[in-house]
Amino acid sequence: MEVTMYTDGAARGNPDGPGGYGVVLHYIDKSGTLHEKELSAGYKKTTNNRMELLAVIRGLEALNRPCQVTVYSDSKYVVDAFNQNWIGGWVKRGWKKSDKKPVKNVDMWKRLLEVMQPHEVRFVWVKGHDGHPENCLLYTSDAADDK
């Protein structure tokens, strides 16, 4: 099954301000019917990067079988980690960056790698807040306001 996932994460007062994430999942079943699922949540103290990662994690966790997933995100942090293979280097170096400093959010990166396992995932960067119809800013702002 092919799934399209649109994700966004945000935090106000970054770091350690309120934040949230939003995810919209789309797939078309065999009869041609479009199915959509929306997920969002807010947190009292977080960072924008943690929320960007959590959006992808929660989206993948919502899938109940192995899928081909295209993730659209405005987070260069998330997209480049895979498309530029930063993550491969981090893992090889024991979760250290090329400058030998520790990678931030290791717990989230490890969880993301774990939930990606049954799926074929590709990441596509989209410009944020540029009128993209599936941009999840609304969800992330609402989720942050709830906290």
Q: What label would you give each PLM region?
A:
Residues 10-16, 57-137:
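RNase H catalytic domain
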Residues 139-147:
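Single conserved hydrophobic/aromatic residue that forms the stacking wall/gate
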Residues 55, 59, 143-144:
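Small-residue (primarily alanine) positions within well-ordered alpha-helices
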Residues 1-50, 54, 61-67:
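RNase H-like nuclease fold core
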